[in-house]
Amino acid sequence: VRYVKVAWEHDFVDEPVLYLSELGGDGYEIRKVQFYRDGRSEWADESHETANSGLAEIPFPPLEEISGQEGLSAEWIDREEFERAWGEAQIDY
């Protein structure tokens, strides 16, 4: 299991600015949290999705590929950082 954080710099009000994902050994998302500029958060796992937050249907791409796109930066994070964000999103829900 690995954890990744992707920041997205943009001017869209209704789009997330930060994504944190838990990835399985096959590269597919197990859980995801996304945060918005206004402080809102949403989350998804195998049993819960929203209209705006769901697990990807394809394996997570290499970090270099993500960070190579304008406005995006990706980095590996530790489990503790992901779990803090996951817990925060659960409280907001």
Ranges and model annotations:
Residues 1-15:
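Short, extreme N-terminal segment that most often corresponds to the first beta-strand
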Residues 58-93:
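Short, compact, well-ordered microdomains
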Residues 15-24:
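Broad, structure-driven detector of short, well-ordered beta-strand segments within folded domains
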Residues 23-68:
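Acidic, aromatic-enriched beta-alpha/helix-loop junctions
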